[in-house]
A protein has these predicted regions:
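Short, charged N-terminal beta->alpha structural module
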Residues: 2-33
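Short glycine-rich or small-residue beta-strand-to-loop segments that form or flank ligand, phosphate
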Residues: 3-9, 53-56, 76-77
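Anaerobic metallocofactor- and corrinoid-dependent redox/one-carbon enzyme cores
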Residues: 8-11, 34-38, 74-80, 86
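Short, structured coil segments at secondary-structure junctions
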Residues: 24, 70-73
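N-terminal beta-loop-helix "entrance" segment that forms/cooperates
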Residues: 25-51
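Short, structured active-site "lid" loops
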Residues: 44-68
Length: 100
């Protein structure tokens, strides 16, 4: 199955994106980054084998914990509120971009 890695601040965002991705044949692996904590840390192997990485955080990419894991991977950024309110559009946009 095609994997998308999602880095987010809460499980609501991850679950909504995961549901939509599953409908389209993609699997979402996610970790929660809140403050200085990482919950459900994703391995470097999973990150490197993913089709894409999606950051849905209310902070800049430079402030992500252990950012070195994400060097040289295809990534996307979206506001958490957009991901929660329109998860289908977010996932469809990523898949469309990957297929181009």
């Amino acid at each position: 199955m095609n994997n998308i890695v999602v880095i987010c601040e809460n499980t609501e965002c991850a679950n909504k994106l995961g549901e939509e991705a599953n409908k389209l044949g993609y699997n979402v692996k996610f970790e929660i980054q809140k403050g200085n904590n990482i919950i459900g840390k994703i391995s470097i192997e999973d990150i490197k084998s993913a089709k894409a990485v999606l950051f849905t955080l209310n902070r800049s990419i430079e402030d992500i914990q252990e950012i070195e894991r994400f060097i040289d991977v295809e990534y996307y950024e979206v506001e958490p509120s957009i991901a929660i309110n329109n998860p289908d559009e977010v996932i469809k946009d990523i898949i469309a971009d990957l297929n181009n």
